[in-house]
């Protein structure tokens, strides 16, 4: 089966600066706080927390760090007041961009996100201006190594996955949001580890950008990734072949 994820071309550009700056654990920690606040610290009954923990493990967050984050979240609930705010807009060449934030100061986050759009050659738009170009999907990325493609495909599809794609170095499993946990847990039960596992916004189509616009857009992504309020950035840019900055 063939998918439309283009994971290496699209998602890898977004996430590498998080890892480089050591911010990804902090961002996931905020998601843990919100998951615990909304559903409690027991993973057996809190599906959202299970999903966030899976995302943390895929990002190589140590188990001890995850446990401490959950424990810390349980003790901080009365003082936690993060607000989930989603911004939409356009990058160079009309690239569609969605920015998800968890913030305790929406004026700060709005100003920072708007600045990143402007400095990256784009502009922030109104709510709904680009979200119709995306679909919410679960996405599980698995490194190929020596894994049996047919076996993995059957496990994923039997558990309810919508699609199974073979890309250059990875397999990408796509699910409906409500089936994400079931499919992920079916793969985990077989000892499969993930490069990435989360529910995200996946574009219906992609916009090819040239090298000049790629440089501008990468600046926007770097600024957004470096913002503590920004949790996720989704876009439909297709970078030039071989682009890696």
Curated annotation (Swiss-Prot):
User: Which UniProt keyword terms apply here?
Assistant: Cytoplasm, DNA-binding, Transcription, Transcription regulation
| Record-level GO cellular component terms | cytosol
The source's domain of life comes to Bacteria
MF term (GO), any: DNA binding
What Pfam families is this protein classified in? TACO1_YebC_N, Transcrip_reg
Q: Where in the cell is it found?
A: Cytoplasm
Q: Which Gene3D superfamilies match?
A: 1.10.10.200, 3.30.70.980
Query: InterPro entries per the record?
Result: Integrase-like_N, TACO1_YebC-like_2nd/3rd_dom, TACO1_YebC_N, Transcrip_reg_TACO1-like, Transcrip_reg_TACO1-like_dom3, YebC-like
- Give a yes or no for keyword Transcription regulation in this entry: yes
Keyword check for Transcription regulation = yes
A biological process (GO) of this protein is: regulation of DNA-templated transcription
Please give the family membership noted in the entry: Belongs to the TACO1 family.
List the protein's name.
Probable transcriptional regulatory protein Cbei_4222
Origin organism is Clostridium beijerinckii (strain ATCC 51743 / NCIMB 8052)
């Amino acid at each position: 089966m063939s998918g439309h994820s283009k994971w290496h071309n699209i998602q890898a550009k977004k996430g590498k600066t998080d890892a480089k700056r050591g911010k990804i654990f902090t961002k996931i920690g905020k998601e843990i706080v919100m998951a615990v606040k909304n559903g409690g610290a027991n993973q057996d009954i809190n599906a959202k927390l299970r999903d966030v923990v899976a995302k943390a493990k895929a990002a190589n967050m140590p188990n001890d760090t995850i446990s401490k984050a959950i424990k810390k979240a349980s003790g901080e609930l009365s003082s936690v007041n993060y607000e989930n705010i989603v911004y939409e807009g356009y990058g160079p060449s009309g690239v569609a961009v969605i920015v998800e934030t968890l913030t305790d100061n929406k004026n700060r986050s709005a100003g920072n996100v708007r600045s990143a759009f402007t400095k990256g050659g784009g502009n922030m738009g109104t709510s709904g201006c680009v979200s119709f170009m995306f679909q919410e999907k679960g996405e599980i990325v698995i490194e190929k190594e020596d894994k049996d493609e047919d076996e993995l495909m059957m496990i994923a599809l039997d558990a309810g996955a919508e699609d199974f794609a073979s890309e250059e170095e990875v397999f990408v499993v796509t699910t409906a949001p409500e089936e994400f946990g079931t499919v992920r847990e079916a793969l985990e039960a077989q000892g499969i580890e993930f490069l990435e596992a989360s529910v995200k916004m996946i574009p219906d189509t992609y916009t090819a950008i040239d090298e000049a616009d790629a440089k501008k857009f990468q600046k926007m992504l770097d600024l957004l990734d470096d913002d503590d309020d920004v949790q996720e950035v989704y876009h439909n840019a297709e970078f030039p072949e071989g682009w890696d900055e």
